[in-house]
Amino acid sequence: MKITNPEALMAASISRRSLVKTSAIGSLALASSAFTLPFSRIAHAAADLASGNVAEKAVWSSCTVNCGSRCLLRLHVKDDTVYWVESDTTGNDEYGNHQVRACLRGRSIRRRMNHPDRLKYPMKRVGKRGEGKFERISWDEALDTIGDNLKRILKDYGNEAVHVLYGTGVDGGNITNSNVPYRLMNACGGYLSRYGSYSTAQISAAMSYMFGGNDGNSPDDIANTKLVVMFGNNPAETRMSGGGVTYYVEQARERSNARMIVIDPRYNDTAAGREDEWLPIRPGTDGALAAAIAWVLITEDLIDKPFLDKYCIGYDETTLPASAPRNAHYKAYILGQGDDGIAKTPQWAAQITSIPAEKIIQLAREIGSAKPAYICQGWGPQRHSNGEQTARAIAMLSVLTGNVGINGGNSGVREGTRDLGVEWFSMLENPVKTQISVFTWTDAIDHGAEMTATRDGVRGKDKLDVPIKFLWCYASNTLINQHGDIAHTHEVLQDDSKCEMIVGIEHFMTASAKYCDILLPDLMPTEQEDLISHESAGNMGYVILGQPATSPKFERKPIYWTLSEVAKRLGPDVYQTFTEGRTQHEWVKYLHAKTKARNPEMPDYEEMKQTGIFKKKCPEEHYVAFRAFREDPAANPLKTPSGKIEIYSERLATLANTWELKKDEIIHPLPAYTPGFDGWDDPLRQRYPLQLTGFHYKARTHSSYGNIDVLQQACPQEIWINPIDAQARGIQHGDTVRVFNQNGEMLIPAKVTPRILPGVTAIGQGAWLNADMFGDKVDRGGSINILTSHRPSPLAKGNPSHSNLVQVEKA
């Protein structure tokens, strides 16, 4: 909807009923006890327009943080400043060709661009790492310092001593992307790379062993289903915009009238009146629930046996690999005929999950009798210490019922999307083949030369030769804020004889920026030209041609220029390989031309500068994961050793027998339930009786937008706690409480709400650390990682950031 009459907008009467019916954010707002929208800011913008404060220009751009969406923005500029933001106003906003409208985060982007705390000049550290003490230096000094130190470290330690830290603060662009330092390092011999991500480490690893890849049906395919079952899946907060999934889920359910069941410790915003049933569950126990559902499906003959026989390995003895022990198949495990001798009955699972046995039986019968059924899981359940096993256990429900590879079904993972075929700015090939897990970089700094393949998941060689000595940190708050166990990370980074140089390229003085040795001010993507691709786009792909809204202010520079200048200092061959003789503008035109060659109907470059976005609906109507495999498994085998769905994995059986694992670190050849560490039944609960889980908060994307005042007011940082637990501790809603465990401590307001299971607490991840790390180390900003662990999960060596035990007291 394009605003042409601000007076009419402000005079319009919006009823509570119409807001709830027509707006996802309406449901979201009314479901929350403390959610207020900054309508006064809208009134202010409308007053500007009404007074004739007309923009000198308006340009198309995009919000490119890591929510999984890339929403179109129309930035109105006057006096070289963005003063008003619209979103997508193109087309007729029809289903399948809808407007990619931004959420409140994207719509507040001018507050990020114009924020008084943005970095302005290059700086070097003059205090201890983490103190935030810097002095201004010239660009030449900064670039020379980086170049000299990088050359020294490459000479003294080799390319494996250089690492590019995981970061997603600039994500989704092509050249404006957190990955661009990879290209620079690959142009000069490579670097120690990583596998996995903080988002999906465990599920990606698990699905590679089960399906040979991680893929799901597009959310619009819910139009063809009879039942939607969501395990820890909350797109209404994680992907709530027009570029995300919530729109598709709503539209598809209108067409199918599918029943929707939400399984989550919290009554999340995806439920929030949309669901037919909410089943609250203890964090980390989804695998036990899945096993009990499987028990009902098997004992009541609700499985698709022909599918299991034809497409799968290891359901029963008929398809069990010859290398496996007797009764090592999935059916035996579920029925209690395997090694543990425990039947996975609903009564067994009820004690673990807190879901009553009769509810489990009812859910199992619904899943077994509704075909197709769209069973999916978000990325929350896998972000646990037992996350790999949980992800496989949930996916087994789709496998057992034969819902894989068909319309209206799913593989049991998160929703998939179509690919438009955008040409990407190549990161070049990395000559260094050694890799570490995305989560173990602090270990690689602290004791890298001791890290091995069988204990730490090192890939490409048996052990690391050298620790990390040089760290690139571009648009990344992972250095301290987004990584597990902040206190431990702080101690590792303090010793600058370990990691000798940390280079930060940032927009703000984040918690992580305070630990950098050289800190460079970056232009935001909205201040640059780029070709930006969709991500969570359902069955409609799109690409945005963003233009710079304003000229560079102070001494901020684009990342491409910055790294090109570093490349010059590394040698003319490195510079040529990195740039290929092109400017950023020339690269954008080149990438546009390549993308257009794959999509001939895409507008020419000059035309697209005016239209902003190109949309293309999937020709197959709905994307179906593993469809080709389902139709002809011989011609289209999966990327597993057998070419089939591997319920029993011989590769995992080998790892379980050869890797160095602690007693509570389990790799299993079957999708078996394992409790994990720091879970609901860990002995540590005697000291810290409440489970603490994280969630993705609508006020931020990870830590991006975490310093925007109106979003902080609309969505305050709180700890969710059930009234039963609050009453036992004398806590009332709004009280400041002390949350603590063996890792750290924070002070935070309490949100006392029945929307969370008793015995469980929750904190939205991504809030900015506000602690004196040289003093009491008590966080007052609500950063959950002051409480999380740096111990990785068993298989993926990923972040178990939702497996935490805490105590909560009134402060």
Locate predicted features.
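Extended redox/cofactor-interaction regions of prokaryotic respiratory oxidoreductases
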Residues: 2-7, 178-263, 270, 288, ...
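A glycine-rich phosphate-binding loop feature that marks nucleotide/adenosyl-phosphate handling sites
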Residues: 310-313, 367, 410-421, 579-594, ...
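Long, contiguous, secondary-structure-rich segments that constitute the structural scaffold
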Residues: 559-611, 703-705, 709-720, 724-811
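Glycine/threonine-rich phosphate-binding loop and adjacent beta-strand/alpha-helix elements that clamp
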Residues: 526-552, 567-569, 648, 752
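Long, well-ordered, tryptophan-enriched scaffold segments
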Residues: 266-370
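Active-site phosphate/pyrophosphate-binding segments
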Residues: 326-445
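Phosphate/diphosphate-binding loops
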Residues: 500-501, 548-567
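N-terminal export/assembly segments and adjacent metallocofactor-ligating motifs
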Residues: 2-302, 328, 461, 469, ...
